Design a protein with these regions (language model features):
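Surface-exposed patches in mature extracellular/periplasmic domains of secreted proteins
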Residues: 6-9, 75-81, 117-120, 192, ...
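Short alpha-helix C-terminal cap/hinge motif
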Residues: 105-116
């Protein structure tokens, strides 16, 4: 497969949380029990799979049940609240290329009465609306890292949520997130850093403020194997182009 599903902020790194919280993670999470989703103390989230029509129907039934429990019901083919207002979401994008991803999603949502409108706008307007948090759904790329730090206070910190043009476009305000980011930035060793990162990832994932999409787990580089040679192993987190320029060599004729 060309792409892999994203699962959490720190997927494909040592900072990624897996399984249930370790004792070190629980020590950081326990003070926030009752203030974060209870699921945080269980297994890490796994994106739902749709291996065919049958699994898609099962997921749609689960979604419909959750919406019904929240007070939404279908009337005249549309999912409506107690006031009779339909659930309409706008997907903001800076170009029309996202339609290939959004259109199938919109069709599936339509089956449970939800209307998803794809709204491509020019980049200037897109940026302006993003800065003012004037959107329902959009796509953002969070840069992968194995050494996260203070930038996460801008991405998910409570103070940043009230500052226009900040990185906290989700608007999350959580004392637990603030404390875990602080713990992460004050870590003096990997043994202190990793539990803080994994605990933060669990809280963000179980808050369901982000819909994980995908990443490419490989670098695609076309080259002449007769003329160029390369090391057998690529170092972790290396950029493909830079690695090729810095370490490949010419084969002898």
């Amino acid at each position: 497969n060309s792409y892999q599903r994203v699962n959490g902020l720190f997927g494909n790194t040592e900072c990624h949380a897996t399984g249930t919280p370790s004792s070190e993670e629980l020590a950081l999470l326990e003070p926030w029990r009752g203030k974060v989703p209870e699921a945080v103390f269980g297994p890490m989230t796994v994106p739902p799979r749709t291996d065919g029509d049958s699994s898609l129907r099962a997921n749609l039934r689960k979604a419909k049940a959750l919406l019904n429990a929240a007070g939404w019901s279908v009337s005249e083919g549309k999912l409506r609240n107690a006031r009779g207002e339909p659930l309409v979401l706008e997907y903001l994008d800076s170009n029309e290329g996202g339609a290939r991803v959004v259109t199938p999603w919109a069709r599936n949502l339509e089956k449970i009465g939800v209307t998803l409108v794809f709204r491509p706008v020019d980049f200037a307007l897109y940026q302006q609306r993003l800065q003012k948090f004037d959107f329902d759904i959009t796509t953002l790329a969070y840069q992968g890292t194995h050494n996260p730090g203070q930038e996460y206070a801008d991405l998910f910190g409570s103070k940043a949520a009230d500052i226009e043009d900040s990185g906290n476009v989700t608007g999350i305000k959580s004392p637990a997130v603030d404390a875990l980011v602080d713990r992460m930035t004050r870590a003096r060793s990997k043994a202190e850093l990793l539990p803080a990162c994994r605990s933060l990832e669990r809280v963000i994932a179980h808050s369901h403020i982000l819909i994980p999409q995908w990443f490419a787990s490989t670098h695609r580089i076309a080259y002449n194997a007769w003329r160029l040679a390369r090391p057998a192993q690529m170092p972790p987190y290396a950029q493909g182009e830079g690695w090729a320029i810095d370490t490949w060599w010419a084969n002898k004729p």
